[in-house]
């Protein structure tokens, strides 16, 4: 079983990280091509392209300039410890054991606009490049055109290494669009998280993002290997609703936010 999640815009390159044998990102040849494109942009162009403030545009202009193809523990950080956001709040990697993180290294992947696909312990340098960014490049008008089949092929290899051909899609639509689902030889399960608001169950973005992280945590800590085991997810007060679910979409509901 392999789970995929989105990255986060907020990064942490300051706090202490446990000692691990870190891995290298697999697709840096492609990352370097994107960096070359981004280095041609002025801070103002970066701000306009990404709809961010002048301050953030300046920061990312500097990040693109400083990015190096060689990833070391001096200039990089393991992806699972670098991303901070709602999904990663739910995952709460800091409280996972070393064995949990090593399990995640085999069973979790993060989609990325710059790196394509990351393993949890892959070293990455600070960047901001969301998958939906309309960055014109040699392959086309945006990052979906740039990545083409690369992410899908890399993901297929990772799934085959699991031996059970099951993909749990916990990524946002923006990022999952980079995966060509029809080309994957795999059973795909999409968990959906609904919260009760005024008597109706609906997706509430903040809660749903955190729940995706909680589901990752559940898979990791319980060493899940069977699709049916996903239905036992009960973190944060969620429960599996079989009547709203299908073969491919597992619906989890919650009445009161915890």
From Swiss-Prot:
InterPro entries referenced in this protein's UniProt entry, alphabetically? YaaA
* One Pfam family cited in the UniProt record for this chain: H2O2_YaaD
The record's HAMAP family line, in alphabetical order, gives: UPF0246
Can you supply a Gene Ontology BP term from the record?
response to hydroperoxide
Residues spanning the membrane: none
Q: Which domain of life is it from?
A: Bacteria
Source organism per entry reads Pasteurella multocida (strain Pm70)
The protein's name in its UniProt record: UPF0246 protein PM0066
**In which family does this protein belong, per the annotation?**
Belongs to the UPF0246 family.
């Amino acid at each position: 079983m392999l789970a995929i999640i989105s990255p986060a815009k907020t990064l942490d390159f300051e706090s202490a990280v446990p000692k691990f044998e870190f891995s290298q990102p697999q697709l840096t040849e492609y990352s370097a091509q994107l960096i070359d494109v981004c280095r041609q942009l002025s801070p103002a162009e970066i701000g306009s392209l990404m709809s961010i403030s002048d301050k953030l545009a300046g920061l990312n202009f500097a990040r693109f300039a400083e990015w190096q193809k060689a990833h070391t523990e001096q200039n990089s950080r393991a992806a699972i410890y670098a991303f901070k956001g709602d999904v990663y709040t739910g995952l709460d990697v800091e409280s996972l054991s070393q064995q949990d993180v090593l399990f995640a290294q085999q069973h979790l992947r993060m989609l990325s606009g710059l790196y394509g696909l990351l393993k949890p312990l892959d070293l990455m340098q600070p960047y901001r490049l969301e998958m939906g960014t309309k960055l014109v490049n040699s392959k086309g008008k945006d990052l979906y055109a740039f990545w083409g089949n690369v992410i899908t092929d890399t993901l297929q290899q990772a799934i085959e290494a699991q031996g059970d051909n099951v993909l749990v899609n916990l990524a946002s639509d923006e990022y999952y669009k980079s995966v060509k689902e029809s080309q994957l030889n795999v059973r795909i399960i999409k968990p959906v998280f609904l919260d009760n608001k005024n008597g109706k169950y609906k997706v509430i973005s903040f809660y749903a993002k955190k729940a995706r992280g909680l589901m990752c945590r559940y898979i990791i800590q319980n060493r899940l290997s069977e699709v049916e085991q996903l239905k036992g997810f009960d973190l944060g007060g969620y429960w599996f609703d079989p009547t709203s679910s299908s073969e491919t979409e597992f619906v989890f509901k919650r009445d009161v936010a915890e």
